[in-house]
Design a protein with these regions (language model features):
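Active-site neighborhoods and metal-handling regions in enzymes and metal-associated proteins
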Residues: 1-210
């Protein structure tokens, strides 16, 4: 069931999203060769707790950490480890969230460790831009398929494939709410986008086909 949020609820969610986004920024700044993914996770945990929120990924579905940290060809759900050392040229995706006042934030980004290849930079840049295309398509009165199509067409036009096995989602008092938000779709099809819907658009892109 899709839960529409009031203006007051959206304001509360903005605080959760702000803390989550700031924690992501701080964690991303720590992405350097020689650093372990556990160290990055600990930085995110400390930031979220310091600002009065709870890390909402921790223990969710049994997940043992604050952030999903995935390197290079790993799509999502990488588990931080003291043994996983970041190397020069890695691209490191960090996905995390914060919960405060009963509402969730959910943010993700990919960071470069030192100097990365031109191919890796292009992949990251395309993924980032596809997010903005999805956001532009997410307008009240539109359809969920408009959002997925915007992401899909932008990436496929540049030779990339979108991941179909994992999707974005609604966000609110639960981290994962309806609807699912795929990175592919047909314009004018799917769930109607209504005022008060809050969704996480999460482009996941592969070189070549997914």
């Amino acid at each position: 069931m899709i839960v529409l949020k009031t203006a007051k609820e959206i304001e509360l969610m903005k605080e959760a999203c702000r803390i989550s986004a700031e924690a992501l920024k701080v964690a991303g700044e720590a992405v350097k060769p020689g650093v372990t993914t556990w160290e990055i996770d600990h930085i995110a945990y400390e930031y979220i707790k310091k600002h009065g929120a709870e890390p909402n990924f921790l223990h969710l579905y049994g997940f043992p950490a604050t952030a999903c940290i995935s390197i290079n060809d790993e799509i999502i759900h990488g588990i931080p480890s003291k043994k996983r050392v970041i190397r020069e040229g890695d691209i490191v995706s960090i996905d995390l969230g914060a919960k405060i006042h009963g509402y969730n934030g959910d943010n993700a980004a990919t960071f470069a460790a030192g100097k990365v290849s031109d191919e890796a930079k292009r992949l990251c840049d395309t993924t980032k831009e596809s997010l903005y295309k999805g956001i532009e398509a997410a307008v009240a009165g539109g359809r969920l398929g408009d959002v997925g199509h915007a992401v899909q067409s932008y990436c496929e036009d540049r030779g990339y494939g979108v991941v179909r096995e994992y999707t974005g989602h609604g966000v609110g008092t639960k981290l994962h709410e309806d609807p699912s938000v795929p990175n592919f779709g047909t314009p004018g099809r799917g769930v109607r986008l209504l005022p008060g819907m809050v969704i996480a658009i999460e482009p996941m892109i592969n070189e070549g086909t997914a």
